Amino acid sequence: MAWGCFVVLLLLAAAPLRLGQRLHLEPGFEYSYDCGVRGMQLLVFPRPNQTVQFKVLDEFGNRFEVNNCSICYHWVTSEAQEHTVFSADYKGCHVLEKDGRFHLRVFIQAVLPNGRVDIAQDVTLICPKPDHTVTPDPYLAPPTTPEPFTPHAFALHPIPDHTLAGSGHTGLTTLYPEQSFIHPTPAPPSLGPGPAGSTVPHSQWGTLEPWELTELDSVGTHLPQERCQVASGHIPCMVNGSSKETCQQAGCCYDSTKEEPCYYGNTVTLQCFKSGYFTLVMSQETALTHGVLLDNVHLAYAPNGCPPTQKTSAFVVFHVPLTLCGTAIQVVGEQLIYENQLVSDIDVQKGPQGSITRDSAFRLHVRCIFNASDFLPIQASIFSPQPPAPVTQSGPLRLELRIATDKTFSSYYQGSDYPLVRLLREPVYVEVRLLQRTDPSLVLVLHQCWATPTTSPFEQPQWPILSDGCPFKGDNYRTQVVAADREALPFWSHYQRFTITTFMLLDSSSQNALRGQVYFFCSASACHPLGSDTCSTTCDSGIARRRRSSGHHNITLRALDIVSSPGAVGFEDAAKLEPSGSSRNSSSRMLLLLLAITLALAAGIFVGLIWAWAQKLWEGIRY
């Protein structure tokens, strides 16, 4: 379906001066109101520390809160410590027409900082005022049906009014004043709905009329050449395509001789985009024409976080999302309406006896209207949430050391299975893991692992198994580090596994075997990778052969960092496990001695038998 978008801009230029004669509401509280061509305006002058609030009353006396509302044509503006302005269109909510005059009842209340209402009173606004005649306003006709999607350029002419009627359009739109704003001499204001004056007074010194406004004049035109004479600081126009027709239909200027042929002109340009953004561009020349400084221009309802996206000496650019920067959103039928205002703060010059300003009050009302029933493609991007921030404070670290039944590490011995029985050189499958941690970025790091003959990790003698996370080089049966299964384990970095070849500890002085059980211990910590630090340990592949012997293993870590095996590892037959040495040599000599004695006895018996047989044979021969 076609994409519909309507843009209406309201450009208000007013001086912060009085409107007509002030009327006393109560002591210290004054107001005045005036009637314009399209609406009425009420000015209230509060006392210090008072905040003015408005409510409108219907024909039955019911009160309704007043807010900036384009549907009801109600607008409230205020100047700090000066005055508060309530503007209402003759077509606005609760404006009643009686005998050719428009009536609006307004309830005014002044609220103190503590929330207490200080002053309150009803005021009835009647336009035109009773002593003036009414001139019919041809602009009060109902708006026409919006046209299909076509980018247009709007020309603005100054008229003494504060409401704009716009033709429907979509896409990229430029509004520009055809004439400079003129500060007219004070004159009686327009006293009822009627057409704009055909002449504009010449510039003279004096006070300013409260409203000098602009209205949409033409649709489908592009900027005149004089608006495209930008001396320096060209800003490329945000438009799809590079043709001259596309550029000019977007309300921008085109010059094929420039590096960026399509650029913004000396005017105010509003662009509404399907992507959910609007772009508002104002030139320095336009700001000076309306008596304001470009540095003081900002979005009226935006917080401090919505500064201009681009600012030069010649232009100020706002490119912001439709849903941010204080933009009001309304749904009317099948239309989505986004509204905001571009305003300028006045530059106040303070002297010893008072203050002055030479700036006008500038207010540009911007509105983007989209057809809510249109179908648009949507592209969704799903971003995984960031992992939680690492915990930096100290706390307990729960570790567990357990022994697996086989090299698959699929099952483990329970507490009742200890002490385990192993023969020399049989493998023992050891695993250390983190408990009660679900942070996938944590890495378990083993520092030292060792064995002792008792349940005390500080008992002597000791034998190192891992040194600084690597297999101890002095072992002729090097400990084998086993990589954790990344697919089978939910947090594989929380595990460290290695395989030990069983051994017996020797006494450091006598070198005799310490018959008994062996206990395993490890010191560990949890590491969080940061930058280039991956928490991994790089080990040297060199092998140094050395006979196991008990030595002092320096343990300086806190007890909370040390984890031990649930039980000991023992041996089935100590005699079978006797290491090679003097006792083994003694047994061999004994066997050899017994064998020698046996052979000697056998030889003696054999010799004796032969001797006896020889004697008998000799005696037989003699006789």
Curated annotation (Swiss-Prot):
Disulfide bonds: 228-253, 237-252, 247-262, 449-470
This protein's record includes keyword Membrane: yes
Spans within the Extracellular topological domain: 21-590
Pyrrolidone carboxylic acid, modified sites: 21
UniProt key word Transport: no
One CC-aspect GO term: extracellular region
One GO-annotated biological process of the protein: single fertilization
Post-translational modification: Proteolytically cleaved before the transmembrane segment to yield the secreted ectodomain incorporated in the zona pellucida. O-glycosylated.
Keywords noted in UniProt: Cell membrane, Cleavage on pair of basic residues, Disulfide bond, Extracellular matrix, Fertilization, Glycoprotein, Membrane, Pyrrolidone carboxylic acid, Secreted, Signal, Transmembrane, Transmembrane helix
Membrane topology, Cytoplasmic segments: 612-623
Residue ranges constituting the P-type domain according to the UniProt record: 226-266
Superkingdom per UniProt: Eukaryota
Chain segments annotated as transmembrane: 591-611
Tissue: Expressed in oocytes.
Membrane topology, record value: Single-pass type I membrane protein
Gene3D superfamilies the UniProt entry points to: Zona pellucida, ZP-C domain, Zona pellucida, ZP-N domain
Endpoints of the signal sequence: 1-20
Compartments in which it is found: Cell membrane
Domains as described in the record: The ZP domain is involved in the polymerization of the ZP proteins to form the zona pellucida.
Role, per record: Component of the zona pellucida, an extracellular matrix surrounding oocytes which mediates sperm binding, induction of the acrosome reaction and prevents post-fertilization polyspermy. The zona pellucida is composed of 3 to 4 glycoproteins, ZP1, ZP2, ZP3, and ZP4. ZP1 ensures the structural integrity of the zona pellucida.
Family of the protein in this entry: Belongs to the ZP domain family. ZPB subfamily.
Subunit structure: Polymers of ZP2 and ZP3 organized into long filaments cross-linked by ZP1 homodimers. Interacts with ZP3.
Protein known as: Zona pellucida sperm-binding protein 1
Organism: Mus musculus (Mouse)
